[in-house]
Amino acid sequence: MNKTPCFSPAHILLPSEQIPVGQWGCVACDQFTSDRSYWEKAAQAAAGGPSTLDLILPEVYLEEDDVDARISAIHAAMDDYTRNVLTRAADGFIYVERTEQSGRVRQGLVGRIDLEAYSYAEGAVPAIRPSEHTVESRIPPRMAVRRGARLETPHIMMLADDPGCTLIEPIGGKKEQLRKVYEGDLMLNGGHIAGWAVEDPALLAQIDSALNALGSQEAFDARYPQAKGGAPLTLAVGDGNHSLASAKACWEELKKTLTPEQQLTHPARWCLAEVCNVHSPAIEIEPIHRVLFNVDCGAVLLALIAWSDSHAAGICFGDAKQQSFTLAGPHVANVLSFEHPVAPLTVGTIDAFIEYFMARHIEARVDYVHDEPAVRALCRQGGVAFLMPPFEKSDLFKGIVMGGVLPRKTFSMGHAEEKRYYMECRNILGEE
């Protein structure tokens, strides 16, 4: 008996061709979490017309008093859009080309992830794994949006370790034979996007075959000889770890109300996502920086020195062979290093200090920002930042295989504007 594939074709819903891409698509909800003005500009760009902005809850609003009303409005918009806006569909995958501002073209395949083949539980080794530690307190707010929702729309980006370019790139080579389902410029400097429906049974079989090969024991043992014989890893979460975890948590909650037969086919068992090849030149793995608010830069530096002394971490000024980073405030920036770090990665050592500091300064708040210019701007407004060193993408899968998960928010795939924009939808409430 063939096992259920971990990534498979879906009944994907799309808006009317009359709705411009620049109005319809908006960036992932977990971006610009300290920049309310960005989301106000997004609302202006949508111009009151149908937009995926109406189907999501930007995290900048998570702590607002009206969050329940916002979620109710989202669910109402989903019902309306299902009837009146999502008038087209593709049965299969969507092959996507995203042209970034730099001119690089990022290729991907949108399909559905089997949540039964994924777990964020510590120590679990399913075919699909998170790339970072899952903070369970971040799941309930996202579950509140998904619970009872008619639709999902994905910003999750999965990664395949496919150096031979067997999964996605061959589909791109045949795009002229495919039905184009959308194309246009994305709002607010998001670049250009185009999508083609992949519905030909021969192409679907080709994708399935390539995925099976990537997830085979033979391929796993060849790629990761240090872990030979271990449970194969087919896909890793690149962006959207907590969104996929929330979908999983909602599914586990719903499963309890379903018969075994219903569990095999209920659409909420799956979650839409885009799969990309980590080896693509268009995939950049960048560090995520830490920014503290409501703190004084000098006080943070003194606390850091005291913490380092108590943990024998060997902090020093200047760039050392071990873990280097930049501590930046409103008026000054210093390169510092740990000569005897307490964690394998710089980000892990910094996170250990931040946890210590936050426990002693209840007024402090921390945010995680991908873009260095955005970090510098926050520093000019009074923030204190820990700027992380570069992250080597070649170590991503090895880190997951050998070490489980990376520290929370270790890396980001590209700048904020390059994140996945919501484009496709899928019904998760009833039969597809």
Locate each region found by the language model.
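Catalytic or ion-translocation cores adjacent to nucleophile or general acid/base/metal-coordination motifs
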Residues: 241-305
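Structural beta-strand/beta-sheet cores of well-ordered domains, especially the beta-sheet scaffolds
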Residues: 51-53, 154-156, 233, 268-274, ...
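Short beta-strand segments
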Residues: 159, 237-238, 274, 387-389
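Glycine-rich phosphate-binding "P-loop"
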Residues: 187-210, 338-341
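N-terminal extension/subdomain marker
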Residues: 1-190, 195-199, 221-225, 391-406, ...
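Charged substrate- and nucleic-acid-binding regions of tRNA-handling and nucleotidyl-transfer enzymes
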Residues: 348-432
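Active-site beta-strand/loop microenvironment that shapes enzyme catalytic pockets
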Residues: 213-258, 263
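C-terminal structural cap/anchor segments
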Residues: 307-375
